[in-house]
């Protein structure tokens, strides 16, 4: 649970602004804004999504700065509520929608600040995913950089030794690497993983559309990555119930529950959200499936100029691809 994760971090005074009031767009305005997002995605050649804790609240994992977030409740001297464990949490509709968007070629890369492992367990391809703050289910060998995805949380935090050794053979016929495996969870002062940060930065700089979901964008440098898209002339869409650090930079701000926004988005794109059939780890993305032939018909909603978005006419541009990451997937030894 994020409660245990937060409790495992070192003491840190500046946790950002917590408990800000939530904003809800009226239903017609929300529908129109999601339609605008669908058009932007359809006409963009490279789309990057940036996700935060807000996409996992529907999975029973509390966020940090929301009205009932871990740190918000901590400031009030109250205990946060939680409904599940990391192992029992199920991917939300948003997690599964992102899987389908990648599968259909609408999503080029995914950058996440979440440590709950739900993107990986949902089946999102790891070669198109940067987990900037780590993953509770992943441990890594510091010698050969091989990562192991476990079926339970690894049990430590702060890049500490987990007590297991790397089993990858150095070369054929020689003994195993036997490097001391460590968790991948960052503490406050730890540097972001070089590879994930490099891929996230490259994807953000080359994208013509960045979409943030369920994040207040307060943590640096993760929260500033979407601005790299803006600096290169791309568009920025922010989906969050609370105000974010970069609202003024956004071309479109959508205030609604992320699951509702993603369900509406998938409907406009003519896509179904797949069901989750249990934990599934996909190391490398599959070739994209054919897209629907066109967007669904535009809804007859007019907002008297409340939404202003410009579009680029590049519906058939190529999709950005990323190199695979060396990953070993297995259950943790008992």
Swiss-Prot record:
Belongs to the sirtuin family. Class IV subfamily. It comes from the Eukaryota. Compared to the defatty-acylase activity, the protein deacetylase activity is weak in vitro, and requires activation. The histone deacetylase activity is strongly activated upon binding to nucleosomes and chromatin in vivo. Two molecules of SIRT6 associate with the acidic patch of one nucleosome, while the C-terminal disordered region of SIRT6 associates with nucleosomal DNA, leading to efficient histone deacetylation. The protein-lysine deacetylase activity is also activated by long-chain free fatty-acids. CDD domains: SIRT7. It is an enzyme of class 2 (transferase). Pfam families: SIR2. NAD(+) binds at residues 53, 57, 64-65, 71, 113, 133, 214, 216, 240, 242, 258. InterPro entries: DHS-like_NAD/FAD-binding_dom, NAD-dep_sirtuin_deacylases, Sirtuin, Ssirtuin_cat_dom. Residues 312-334 are annotated as: Disordered. This is NAD-dependent protein deacylase sirtuin-6. The modification N-acetylserine is found at residue 2. Induction: By cold. In hepatocytes, expression is increased following incubation in a ketonic medium. The keyword GTP-binding does not apply. The modification N6-acetyllysine is found at residue 33.
């Amino acid at each position: 649970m994020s409660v245990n994760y937060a409790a495992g971090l070192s003491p840190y005074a500046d946790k950002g602004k917590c408990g800000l009031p939530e904003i809800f767009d009226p239903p017609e305005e929300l529908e129109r804004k999601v339609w605008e997002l669908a058009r932007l995605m359809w006409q963009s050649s490279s789309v990057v999504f940036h996700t935060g804790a807000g996409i996992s609240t529907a999975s029973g994992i509390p966020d940090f700065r929301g009205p009932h977030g871990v740190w918000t409740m901590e400031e009030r001297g109250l205990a946060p509520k939680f409904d599940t464990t990391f192992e029992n949490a199920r991917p939300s509709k948003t997690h599964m929608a992102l899987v389908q968007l990648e599968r259909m070629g609408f999503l080029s890369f995914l950058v996440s600040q979440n440590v709950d492992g739900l993107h990986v367990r949902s089946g999102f391809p790891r070669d198109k995913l940067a987990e900037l703050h780590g993953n509770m289910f992943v441990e890594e060998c510091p010698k050969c950089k091989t990562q192991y995805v476990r079926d339970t949380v690894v049990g430590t935090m702060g890049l500490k030794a987990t007590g297991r050794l790397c089993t990858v053979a150095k070369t054929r016929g020689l003994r195993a690497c036997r490097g001391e495996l460590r968790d991948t969870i960052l503490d406050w002062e730890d540097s972001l993983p070089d590879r994930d940060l490099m891929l996230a930065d490259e994807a953000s700089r080359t994208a013509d559309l960045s979409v943030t979901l369920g994040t207040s964008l307060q943590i640096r440098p993760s929260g500033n990555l979407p601005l790299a898209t803006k600096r290169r002339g791309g568009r920025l869409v922010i989906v969050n119930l609370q105000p974010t650090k970069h609202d003024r930079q956004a071309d479109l701000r959508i205030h609604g529950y992320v699951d509702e926004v993603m369900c509406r988005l998938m409907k406009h794109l003519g896509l179904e959200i797949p069901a989750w059939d249990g934990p599934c780890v996909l190391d490398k993305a599959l070739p994209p499936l054919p897209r629907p032939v066109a967007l669904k018909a535009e809804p007859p909603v007019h907002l008297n100029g409340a939404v202003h978005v410009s579009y680029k006419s590049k519906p058939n541009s190529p999709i950005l691809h990323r190199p695979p990451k060396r990953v070993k997937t297995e259950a943790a030894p008992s």
